[in-house]
Curated annotation (Swiss-Prot):
InterPro entries: dUTPase, dUTPase-like, dUTPase-like_sf, dUTPase_trimeric. This is Deoxyuridine 5'-triphosphate nucleotidohydrolase. Its EC number is 3.6.1.23. Substrate binds at R65, S66, G67, N78, L82, I83, D84, M92. The gene is dut. It holds the Pfam family dUTPase. Pathway: Pyrimidine metabolism; dUMP biosynthesis; dUMP from dCTP (dUTP route): step 2/2. GO terms for molecular function: dUTP diphosphatase activity; magnesium ion binding. Gene3D superfamilies: 2.70.40.10. This enzyme is involved in nucleotide metabolism: it produces dUMP, the immediate precursor of thymidine nucleotides and it decreases the intracellular concentration of dUTP so that uracil cannot be incorporated into DNA. It comes from the Bacteria. It comes from Thiobacillus denitrificans (strain ATCC 25259 / T1). Belongs to the dUTPase family. PANTHER family: DEOXYURIDINE 5'-TRIPHOSPHATE NUCLEOTIDOHYDROLASE (PTHR11241:SF0).
């Protein structure tokens, strides 16, 4: 799969999988100067990367980095970013400071992660009824807590 890099600043810090079992790779803030996110503020941050998956059997997800969310309250403004296989533009991260403290985002800081996932496009058929299952229409805790 070919991932194109738009920003030459990433040349020395190419995205990579940190371990053999890593599902995601880090996206960095490709900014020229630090950005301060005030409490409650949301800002679009460029990553310097463009992606064109081309294969409709794949999509990419932009997910938050757990450390930024837990330690600093920095999460994604849209919670999850979905990148369709036919998108060709630069990846942008919607950074949301949900904490009560300002947060300074510095150039090339790791801000989010990218995961490439398989996609199945469903067909829909109108039916008179579903086959009966043990669960039936039970939802929201219907199978118990333990």
């Amino acid at each position: 799969m070919d991932v194109k890099i738009l920003d030459a600043r990433l040349r020395d810090q190419l995205p990579h999988y940190a371990t053999p079992g890593a599902a995601g790779l880090d996206l960095r803030a490709c900014i020229d100067a630090p950005i301060t996110l005030a409490p409650g503020e949301t800002r679009l941050v460029p990553t310097g990367m463009a992606i064109h998956l081309a294969d409709p059997g794949y999509a990419a997800l932009i997910l938050p980095r757990s450390g930024l969310g837990h330690k600093h309250g920095i999460v994604l403004g849209n919670l999850v970013g979905l990148i369709d296989s036919d998108y060709q533009g630069q990846l942008m991260v919607s950074a949301w400071n949900r904490s009560e403290q300002s947060f300074e985002l510095v150039p090339l800081e790791r801000l989010a992660q990218l995961v490439i996932v398989p996609v199945v496009q469903a067909r829909f058929n109108i039916v008179e009824a579903f086959e009966t299952t043990a669960r039936g229409e039970g939802g929201f805790g219907s199978t118990g807590r333990q």
